[in-house]
């Protein structure tokens, strides 16, 4: 068995307009508009910007039949201007809108969590097996006519499962779990297969990269068991903006791409949608460049759980390994990092490392060694993983710190590449620390900040405030980008606090399930505020909402004054 070589998962081909997905086609790139779908001119202009940036597909929200119909008008205007790539309608809660969109767009995204099932209320529902089967039959009665319209108009479908919008029915039987997310998709896929409708792709997303990666792996395993090979759409929902959003997306998406999983990618940023495209292109190009590399021999360790990995057991050498959080070390000097807030745990000169290249096949390592592991392979993550799995199977518990170097001078390039590489190693539980060398960055110390950002994005260590912010869409009725910047500026000193900033209620309360506080769009220029899952204040005007949010944080004892 050979577990560490890059090769794409085999998937079936789905025809989406004039840009097919899956099979031997390239990994496709997409984004979503943030304009009102009823504003034809603004939507056309934004679609053009997204396509000009390099997107293969653009998705537009369709809250109702009017919006779904108008996507057809937008499509016609784009075609008249020479833009013929596919448009996708995004549907939640409204099957009638999906029926209309099936006749006006190239693909319709439906959400199994709310296409037939009511919006989630977080209530526990009790079903007998017979009652549960009746609910599935209700889904079939709604889905089959929809598929008939799609078939008539040669319209593809995406089943888009979101962690934040699982139905109460699924939650009651499976819990708020990866298994529940997978079953939410499989219920629909089984109907699609029985109806011989094959132009379907699947996404299964979460804002938590650990859950997102585990769930996609579970879905692939379940589809393999049932001999399904539908193409997969990858994304981390509510990844945020700036450095954090790019790193978090690279950690989640990059980990799966490196395993050969994924046929289309959307990097969700709380920014203008066309800015998502270069990030996605860089990520896909970086991973797919590994194709055809020199073979890496090795197998997963016997104790390794490839679906939901736990951390490799290691010996604690000082504060490295064992039960210690993964460390950040640097080759920079103390003077180089004097100005940054969170200092590295170690300078390379502080520790008696045992430097090893991952191509080394020797086995003479002590449990008291701290291995500083590097790779010069075209697929460095694969070679590093093979080395560590060999250690594991040989019973060696020496902690491993991985050092990787990037020659790029562009900050985004380093964020994407390092996020994908270190993110995979961290999510797979294989490393006890990281060293990120980026000597050509304008500010060398940024490499240390990126290192801590990667650890936090992989849910391995928290060193700053966590923001769960969505990219906005046509459902968002307030200035989300401004709100994100404003909230970050006021709360970024609250280390360890999680704040959700969401455009609307589609995923809002659900994706914020583990957030401490939430700021969710409610109406034009108004938001609702949450403490955990509980809405504590509704319809707050945006111009005073930040003050109300800070007051809420203070009232619950989570506020500290920023240091001057």
Each model region followed by its residue ranges:
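N-terminal amphipathic alpha-helix/helix-capping segment at the start of soluble metabolic enzymes
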Residues: 1-31, 147, 151-153, 289-335, ...
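Active-site mouth loops of central-metabolism enzymes
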Residues: 24-42, 86-94, 169-182, 237-247, ...
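Conserved, mostly hydrophobic/aromatic
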Residues: 29, 90, 159, 202, ...
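Glycine-rich, proline-tolerant flexible connector loops at the mouths of alpha/beta enzymes
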Residues: 34, 53-78, 112-134, 200-209, ...
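Glycine-rich phosphate-binding active-site loops on the catalytic face of alpha/beta enzymes
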Residues: 56-59, 105-121, 259-274, 429-442, ...
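N-terminal active-site wall of soluble small-molecule enzyme domains
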Residues: 62-104, 335-338
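Hydrophobic or amphipathic alpha-helical targeting/insertion segments
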Residues: 84-122, 129-149, 153-154
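Catalytic alpha/beta core domains of metabolic enzymes, predominantly
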Residues: 126-143, 148, 171-315, 364-494, ...
């Amino acid at each position: 068995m050979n577990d560490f070589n890059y090769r794409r998962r085999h998937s079936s081909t789905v025809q989406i307009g004039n840009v097919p997905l899956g099979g031997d086609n390239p990994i496709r790139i997409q984004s979503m508009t943030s304009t009102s779908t009823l504003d034809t001119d603004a939507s056309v202009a934004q679609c053009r910007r997204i396509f000009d940036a390099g997107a293969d597909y653009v998705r537009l929200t369709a809250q109702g039949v009017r919006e779904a119909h108008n996507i057809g008008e937008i499509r016609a205007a784009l075609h008249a201007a020479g833009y013929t790539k596919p448009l996708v309608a995004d549907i939640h809660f409204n099957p009638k809108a999906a029926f209309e969109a099936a006749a006006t767009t190239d693909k319709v995204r439906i959400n199994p969590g709310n296409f037939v099932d009511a919006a989630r209320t977080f209530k526990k529902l009790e079903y007998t097996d017979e009652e549960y089967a009746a609910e599935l039959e209700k889904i079939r009665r709604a889905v089959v006519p929809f598929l008939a319209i799609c078939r008539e108009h040669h319209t593809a479908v995406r089943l888009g499962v979101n962690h934040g919008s699982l139905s109460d029915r699924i939650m009651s039987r499976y819990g708020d779990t990866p298994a529940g997310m997978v079953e939410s998709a499989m219920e629909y896929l089984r109907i699609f297969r029985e109806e011989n409708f094959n132009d379907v792709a699947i996404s299964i997303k979460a804002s938590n990269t650990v859950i997102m990666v585990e769930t996609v792996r579970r879905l692939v395993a379940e589809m393999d068991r049932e001999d399904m090979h539908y193409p997969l759409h990858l994304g981390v929902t509510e990844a945020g903006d700036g450095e954090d959003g790019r790193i978090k997306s690279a950690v989640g998406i990059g980990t799966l791409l490196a395993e050969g999983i994924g046929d289309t990618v959307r990097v969700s940023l709380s920014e203008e949608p066309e800015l998502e495209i270069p990030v996605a292109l860089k990520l896909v190009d970086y991973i797919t460049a590994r194709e055809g590399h020199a073979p890496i021999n090795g197998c997963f360790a016997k104790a390794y759980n490839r679906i939901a990995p736990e951390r490799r057991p290691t010996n604690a050498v000082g504060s490295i390994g064992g039960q210690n959080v993964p460390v950040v070390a640097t080759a920079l000097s103390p003077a180089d990092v004097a100005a940054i807030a969170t200092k590295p745990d170690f300078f390379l000169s502080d520790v008696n490392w045992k430097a090893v290249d991952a191509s080394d096949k020797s086995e003479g390592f002590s449990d008291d060694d701290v291995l500083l592991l590097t790779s010069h392979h075209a697929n460095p993550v694969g070679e590093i993983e093979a080395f560590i799995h060999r250690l594991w199977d040989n019973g060696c518990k020496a902690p491993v710190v991985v050092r990787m170097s990037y020659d790029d001078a562009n900050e985004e390039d380093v964020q994407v590449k390092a996020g994908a590489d270190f993110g995979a190693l961290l999510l797979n539980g294989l490393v006890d620390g990281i060293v990120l060398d980026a000597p050509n960055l304008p500010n060398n110390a940024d490499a240390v900040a990126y290192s801590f950002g990667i650890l936090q994005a992989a849910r391995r260590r928290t060193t700053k405030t966590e923001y769960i912010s969505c990219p906005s869409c046509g459902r968002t009725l307030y200035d989300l980008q401004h709100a994100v910047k404003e909230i970050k500026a006021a709360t970024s000193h609250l280390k360890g606090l999680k704040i959700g900033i969401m455009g609307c209620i589609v995923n809002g309360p659900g994706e914020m399930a583990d957030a401490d506080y939430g700021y969710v769009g409610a109406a034009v220029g108004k938001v609702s505020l949450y403490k955990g899952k509980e809405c504590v204040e509704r319809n707050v005007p945006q111009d005073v909402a930040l003050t109300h949010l800070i007051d809420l944080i203070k009232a619950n004892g989570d506020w500290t004054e920023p240091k001057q």
